[in-house]
Amino acid sequence: MQLNSTEISELIKQRIAQFNVVSEAHNEGTIVSVSDGVIRIHGLADCMQGEMISLPGNRYAIALNLERDSVGAVVMGPYADLAEGMKVKCTGRILEVPVGRGLLGRVVNTLGAPIDGKGPVDNDGFSAVEAIAPGVIDRQSVDQPVQTGYKAVDSMIPIGRGQRELIIGDRQTGKTALAIDAIINQRDSGIKCIYVAIGQKASTISNVVRKLEEHGALANTIVVVATASESAALQYLAPYAGCAMGEYFRDRGEDALIIYDDLSKQAVAYRQISLLLRRPPGREAFPGDVFYLHSRLLERAARVNADYVEAFTKGEVKGKTGSLTALPIIETQAGDVSAFVPTNVISITDGQIFLESNLFNAGIRPAVNPGISVSRVGGAAQTKIMKKLSGGIRTALAQYRELAAFSQFASDLDDATRKQLDHGQKVTELLKQKQYAPMSVAQQSLVLFAAERGYLADVELAKIGSFEAALLAYVDRDHAPLMQEINQSGGYNDEIEGKLKGILDSFKATQSW
């Protein structure tokens, strides 16, 4: 078939008429300076606060400073090859991370990309990293417990679902160990866990992940990682990314627990970004909004009511409340809790667990100082049996601390004082607990009952540990149904009291330790 010139020209005209040029308008700017992960861009007139800016090489920066003729942005990722004169453009989007059940059991970076070598993440959607916390009307009071598995914490400093409880102490006092054991104890509780590691060594995080896997808790946990070698921007954003992943469960009528390990390093990363952006420094060179940095994060941990969940899920989930419980960690310098960041976070949270290096070095682990540790709202969430049995423990320890200080100067003590000192020493010994060995409510209750009712009076101090181990082995073998009943109901009445008394009487009469 041959075409003449007229037909060819007609075909060309038809094609030209059909051709549709799609014009895409985008806001483009030019990098005018690059320094330590912070870039200054000229020409982005319509840029939003917190907007993602597309950089060459499939990377992004986040706009944090909007000035008269330029935009200051932090680069999320490597920045060594960025140079002045490079073209960048606005995306019109704010930062979002993948959320959903598919992230459980995975290790991801701040942007939600997998770093565990197990293939792509199967997410249910994306959520904005920055979100407004639920309002007062959407919240419900805290009245259900989160069991950490530690006798010292669950008895004296109880934590409720939706609470923010600070874990504070010097380095090497067992802060991360306490948080990891709390995650391990949620294996069978139905609470989903998120562990956010900020500014830590990759080897340390690898150990944590391995321990969670060994104890069967990784399948229930999302690990969000921003290592010490990553940019300050990623360390600053990691807690918000982890929080968005936790809110997915909270807003669908489920319970979640999030650990921020630790917020001191996030504050340092934010200080670095702020100083590079030339924001005015304040106390300890932190910027003026460092309080807001943590308050807007921790206020997102809440117990939300059934109406909120129903409205959020558009009626799919009815009659269920959701919660996100936060355990932020703060590292102090030489026990100074009056420094800027520690005082900020203490004032934001609903209580704190204070870990002391003196107690840790004395072999009292967990090194909880019950004198200045407090839970402001957890008491309402404590199980009935723990509430009944733990009151005397706190009193005994308070009296012991007072008398121990006094007894250093007094040589002759009366019998009542000696008994109080002896009881205090034994309770302190009883509250010691090994790492990765969380205890159930029933086991804790039995041990506290023994201390409360004077069953330790004739047990030598050195044998308290073996007494406890033998007692727990005895009840697991011969009284498993009662333990199960206490674990399920958490109740306390005359019948349960009588049974516990009977168990301890028969144990002391027939068993050795």
Swiss-Prot record:
SUPFAM superfamilies, per database record: C-terminal domain of alpha and beta subunits of F1 ATP synthase, N-terminal domain of alpha and beta subunits of F1 ATP synthase, P-loop containing nucleoside triphosphate hydrolases
Residues noted as binding ATP in the record, renumbered to the chain: 169-176
Keyword tags: ATP synthesis, ATP-binding, Cell inner membrane, Cell membrane, CF(1), Hydrogen ion transport, Ion transport, Membrane, Nucleotide-binding, Translocase, Transport
Subcellular location, record wording: Cell inner membrane
Membrane topology classification: Peripheral membrane protein
Cellular compartments per GO CC: plasma membrane; proton-transporting ATP synthase complex
Record-level Gene Ontology MF annotations: ADP binding; ATP binding; proton-transporting ATP synthase activity, rotational mechanism
GO biological process: proton motive force-driven ATP synthesis
Enzyme category, top tier: translocase
EC nos: 7.1.2.2
Catalytic activity: ATP + H2O + 4 H(+)(in) = ADP + phosphate + 5 H(+)(out)
Alphabetized PROSITE patterns for the sequence: ATPASE_ALPHA_BETA
UniProt-listed InterPro entries: ATP_synth_asu-like_sf, ATP_synth_asu_C, ATP_synth_asu_C_sf, ATP_synth_F1_a_nt-bd_dom, ATP_synth_F1_asu, ATPase_a/bsu_AS, ATPase_F1/V1/A1_a/bsu_N, ATPase_F1/V1/A1_a/bsu_N_sf
Keyword field contains Coiled coil: no
Site (Required for activity): 373
Highest taxon in the source lineage: Bacteria
Main location: membrane
Statement: the UniProt record of this protein carries the keyword Membrane: yes
Function: Produces ATP from ADP in the presence of a proton gradient across the membrane. The alpha chain is a regulatory subunit.
Protein family (similarity comment): Belongs to the ATPase alpha/beta chains family.
Record-linked NCBIfam families: atpA, PRK13343.1
Subunit structure: F-type ATPases have 2 components, CF(1) - the catalytic core - and CF(0) - the membrane proton channel. CF(1) has five subunits: alpha(3), beta(3), gamma(1), delta(1), epsilon(1). CF(0) has three main subunits: a(1), b(2) and c(9-12). The alpha and beta chains form an alternating ring which encloses part of the gamma chain. CF(1) is attached to CF(0) by a central stalk formed by the gamma and epsilon chains, while a peripheral stalk is formed by the delta and b chains.
Full protein name: ATP synthase subunit alpha
Organism the protein comes from: Salmonella typhimurium (strain LT2 / SGSC1412 / ATCC 700720)
